[in-house]
């Protein structure tokens, strides 16, 4: 909401400039756990989802810190490979999706660990498997559809379809929208 966004702006600016070390960590709320494991009792569903998060976060590894160092090196190698290729566009194809996304001139691939202003390496998102770059604002063509529901600020949205022409959204549709509990 607007008030929350305004109040959080100073912190968000410090975070995006890496003035401070920060991290976002997933934790299983009851509604999320029951959606993932509907046949389990509430406590069991939360425990099962917590275990999945621990596994994806490398917490269960014998040496989680070493595991993250190895993972960060892998992400760095992927970023470097993508930057060397200097792709002009990415073409996404899949169920309900045929989307070409042009990449910005002089784009750079990023992701994985970051160095904060204090010299400490941090992983902003745990778990994370992503590398990312900047799209060209005017070179997005085609359509993309969701294959899973989207949870946006406490609302589940299903069957999303978005059509792009010359970088602009020209059509949006969805078939289901409902509020859900986030606890």
Region spans (language model):
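Metallocofactor- and cofactor-centric catalytic cores in central/energy metabolism, strongly enriched
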Residues: 152, 157-159
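Tryptophan-anchored aromatic micro-motifs
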Residues: 144-145, 173
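Short, basic/aromatic recognition patches
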Residues: 148
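Active-site bordering "gate/hinge" segments
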Residues: 1-141, 183
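Short, acidic, Ser/Thr-enriched surface-loop or helix-capping motifs
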Residues: 164
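Conserved small/polar residues in nucleotide/adenosyl-binding loops
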Residues: 175-182
């Amino acid at each position: 909401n607007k008030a929350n966004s305004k109040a959080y702006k100073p912190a968000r600016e410090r975070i995006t400039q890496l003035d401070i070390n920060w991290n976002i960590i997933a934790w299983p709320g009851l509604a999320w756990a029951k959606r993932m494991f509907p046949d389990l009792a509430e406590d069991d569903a939360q425990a099962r989802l917590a275990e999945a998060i621990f596994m994806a976060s490398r917490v269960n590894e014998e040496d989680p810190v070493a595991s993250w160092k190895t993972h960060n090196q892998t992400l760095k190698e992927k970023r470097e490979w993508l930057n060397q290729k200097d792709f002009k566009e990415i073409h996404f194809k899949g169920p309900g999706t045929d989307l070409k996304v042009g990449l910005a001139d002089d784009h750079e691939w990023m992701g994985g660990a970051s160095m904060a202003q204090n010299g400490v390496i941090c992983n902003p998102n745990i778990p994370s498997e992503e590398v990312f770059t900047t799209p060209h604002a005017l070179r997005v063509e085609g359509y993309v559809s969701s294959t899973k529901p989207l949870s946006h600020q406490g609302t589940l949205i299903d069957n999303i379809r978005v059509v792009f022409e010359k970088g602009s959204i020209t059509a949006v549709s969805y078939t289901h929208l409902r509020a859900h509990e986030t606890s």
